[in-house]
């Protein structure tokens, strides 16, 4: 497999579960040959049960279905829930599951964080949505704001090949092409062009971040980044300020109502640096932000699973698509500017932490801990992640008519 820009694709932006889940379930319902689904979280709630029903129906009509769940993100599916799928023929794997220690999950680092669906080499979905009711507006104030894309065209074959190369037993072939192939330069940006990029812990450790940095270097007019967990490294922060100082309008949308308090603490450590450097920072206040999208000028955009924090940039398995398409760029721009106008508060100097020695000391210590601890973990020796396949449930012993007659009469057959 070679990473390259693919032309002639159909690209559709999907916002939140209201748009994403019906599109995915419809595609699964129309699948004829193969379904591959990867996700970090699958809950046994209303949304999870709909996915369960769609996959079960597909398997029962003869479609080959394979599921990869992260062992940390999805630890609590019931045996009955999973066994019903495996009994129907669904190949069900957990990425690097570990036993709990005193009831707590310990396998927090190097997770499989991708969210990908491939249907028959015809349709693919990639983005930030998991399978849980948290992505539906009906969930309430804690419902997540998120994005994905539906793709048709040549890029789907690349995504399918990426998935096939990552199945068990393909490691030798995978290492050969990963060692030699990097994404080539798109020297003639056009329309409906898509590139698959990913992060792993082998030869593609910084591919997604590298595309972001290149985008910031090439930006001429405007960059909008909406990212749920924003805590990048020095190079990224420096590139943001440098772009702002040469006149690029930089809009950064981050969580104002985070699902984890430390997310807000981490982001606010950067406010002085960013705002005083000319970056427009907006806190999204309507509900928790879970999206991972960005755009540049009038043609470049990205959507995927990668946050801009140490876990995504240094440890987790992630996947994004880079898109060159003016129509898609405008659609995403309209959406992001809409939530800025309706649901965001711009961070101004009155909201910045006071520049005291104590605050500066706290910020420096917290920044270095939050930023470097996960990265340091990434350099520690790591075991080879294990893919644990869940086998079909054992079939009950069949009661033959002879056995029944023997029990009823007491006579041996």
Swiss-Prot record:
Q: Which coarse location class applies to the principal site listed for this UniProt protein?
A: membrane
Any one Gene Ontology cellular component term annotated for this protein:
plasma membrane
**N-terminal signal peptide:** none
The protein's location, in the record's own words, is: Cell membrane
The active site of this protein is located at 113, 115, 120, 290, 292, 297
Q: Which Pfam families match?
A: PLDc_2
**Gene Ontology biological process:** cardiolipin biosynthetic process
Q: Which UniProt keywords apply?
A: Cell membrane, Lipid biosynthesis, Lipid metabolism, Membrane, Phospholipid biosynthesis, Phospholipid metabolism, Repeat, Transferase
Q: Which GO terms describe its molecular function?
A: cardiolipin synthase activity
Q: How does it sit in the membrane?
A: Peripheral membrane protein
Family annotation (SMART domains):
PLDc
Q: Enumerate the spans annotated as PLD phosphodiesterase domain.
A: 108-135, 285-312
Assigned EC number? 2.7.8.-
**Keyword Disulfide bond part of the UniProt annotation:** no
InterPro entries named in the record: Cardiolipin_synth_ClsB, PLD-like_dom, PLipase_D/transphosphatidylase
Residue ranges for the region (Disordered) are 390-413
The reaction(s) annotated as catalysed by this protein in its Swiss-Prot or TrEMBL entry are: 2 a 1,2-diacyl-sn-glycero-3-phospho-(1'-sn-glycerol) = a cardiolipin + glycerol
User: Main EC class of this protein?
Assistant: transferase
To which protein family does this belong?
Answer: Belongs to the phospholipase D family. Cardiolipin synthase subfamily. ClsB sub-subfamily.
Q: Which HAMAP family does the record match to this protein?
A: Cardiolipin_synth_ClsB (MF_01917)
Say what the protein does: Catalyzes the phosphatidyl group transfer from one phosphatidylglycerol molecule to another to form cardiolipin (CL) (diphosphatidylglycerol) and glycerol.
This chain's protein is named Cardiolipin synthase B
Write the lineage as a comma-separated list.
Answer: Bacteria, Pseudomonadati, Pseudomonadota, Gammaproteobacteria, Enterobacterales
């Amino acid at each position: 497999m070679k990473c390259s820009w693919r032309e002639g694709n159909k690209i559709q932006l999907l916002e939140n579960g209201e748009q994403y889940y019906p599109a995915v379930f419809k595609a699964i319902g129309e699948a004829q040959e193969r379904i591959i689904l990867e996700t970090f979280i699958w809950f046994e709630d209303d949304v999870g049960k709909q996915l369960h029903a769609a996959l079960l129906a597909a398997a029962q009509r003869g479609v080959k279905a394979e599921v990869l769940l992260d062992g940390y993100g999805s630890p609590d599916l019931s045996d009955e829930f999973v066994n019903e799928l495996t009994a129907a023929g669904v190949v069900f794997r957990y990425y690097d599951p570990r036993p709990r220690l005193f009831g707590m999950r310990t396998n927090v680092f190097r997770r499989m964080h991708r969210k990908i669906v491939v249907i028959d080499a015809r349709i693919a979905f990639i983005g930030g949505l998991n399978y849980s009711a948290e992505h539906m507006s009906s969930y309430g104030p804690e419902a997540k704001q998120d994005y994905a894309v539906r793709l048709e065209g040549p890029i789907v074959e690349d995504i399918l090949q990426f998935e096939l190369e990552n199945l068990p037993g393909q490691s030798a072939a995978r290492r050969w092409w990963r060692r030699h192939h990097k994404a080539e330069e798109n020297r003639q940006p056009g329309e409906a062009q898509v590139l698959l990029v990913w992060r792993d812990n082998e030869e593609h450790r910084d591919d997604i971040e590298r595309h972001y940095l290149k985008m910031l270097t090439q930006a001429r007019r405007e960059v909008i980044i909406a990212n749920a967990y924003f805590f990048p490294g020095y190079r990224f922060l420096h590139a943001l300020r440098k772009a702002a100082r040469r006149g690029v309008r930089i809009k950064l949308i981050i969580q104002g109502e985070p699902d984890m308090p430390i997310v807000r603490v981490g982001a606010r450590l950067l406010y002085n640096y960013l705002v005083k450097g000319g970056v427009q920072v907006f806190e999204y206040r309507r509900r928790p932000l879970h999206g991972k999208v960005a755009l540049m000028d009038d043609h470049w955009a990205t959507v995927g699973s990668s946050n801009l924090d140490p876990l995504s940039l240094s440890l987790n398995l992630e996947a994004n698509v880079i898109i060159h398409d003016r129509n898609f760029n405008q659609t995403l721009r309209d959406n992001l500017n809409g939530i800025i106008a309706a649901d965001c508060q711009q961070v101004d100097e009155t909201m910045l932490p006071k520049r005291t020695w104590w605050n500066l000391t706290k910020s420096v210590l917290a920044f270095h801990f939050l930023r470097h601890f996960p990265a340091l973990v990434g350099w520690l020796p790591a075991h080879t992640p294990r893919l644990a396949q869940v086998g079909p449930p054992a079939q009950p012993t069949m009661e033959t008519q002879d056995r029944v007659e023997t029990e009823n009469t007491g006579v041996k057959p």
